[in-house]
Design a protein with these regions (language model features):
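Glycine-rich phosphate-binding loop of ATP-dependent small-molecule kinases
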Residues: 1-217
Length: 217
């Protein structure tokens, strides 16, 4: 049984790795976005409360999010442990999570931090292009068109979404780095942070994270 949080900047592959680890170790992958949608669909009191905040364009309060998380980890599919993705995002949230878990005789055991050089993050995040004519999606790293910025399928001119453009991506990375590094320091002070090399084949990265989990299992 392991309770962990997966840290990493946008483009580090947290979603892919969390899914891989969850399948390999039979633990629950908890994405806060998915948790909100599931609780709302199930009509739980906290889920409906969270939906009310989101429908008004407001942030869901920490106590509601943590309450939903505690409800979620008490379900049978979390019996073998869980991996949090997307929460906490602040020291206040991390501290509140620690207190809440302690009240349920649980604690975060380890925090793998997927580390990827910024130039590779930029390449991953700015590499997506799409064809407005046939909706085909390309990526300069994983699925490059035969001719730059030209669609293989219909020869249309490929375009890049505004949120995939370098200036926007750089701002997003800078914002996320600030809170991610703050959290990393928080968990490092608890001796729970474990940096993981996030370069190379995704299956190799999964093996690195599994090795970290095996150390404390």
């Amino acid at each position: 049984m392991v309770y962990c949080i997966l840290l990493g900047l946008p483009g580090a592959g947290k979603g892919t790795q969390a899914s891989n680890i969850a399948a390999d170790r039979a633990i629950l992958h908890i994405s806060t976005g998915d948790m909100f949608r599931e609780a709302s669909a199930n009509g739980t009191s906290l889920g409906l409360e969270a939906q009310g905040y989101m429908s008004r364009g407001e942030l869901v309060p920490d106590d509601v999010t943590i309450g939903m998380l505690l409800e979620r980890i008490e379900q049978k599919d979390a019996a073998s442990g869980f991996m949090l993705d997307g929460f906490p995002r602040t020291i206040k949230q991390a501290e509140a999570l620690d207190v809440a878990l302690k009240s349920h005789n649980k604690q975060i055991d380890v925090v793998p931090y997927i580390k990827v050089p910024e130039d590779l993050l930029m390449a991953r995040l700015t590499g997506r292009w799409s064809c407005p004519d046939c909706s085909e999606i390309y990526h300069t790293i994983t699925k490059a068109p035969e001719v730059d910025e030209i669609c293989d399928s219909c020869t249309g001119q490929l375009v890049q979404r505004s949120d995939d453009q370098p200036d926007t991506v750089k701002t997003r990375l800078d914002t996320n780095r600030e809170w991610t590094e703050t959290l990393a320091t928080y968990y490092e002070n608890q001796n729970k942070l474990r940096p993981v090399d996030g370069t190379g084949d995704p299956t190799v990265i999964t093996e690195r994270i599994i090795s970290v989990l095996d150390e404390i299992s």
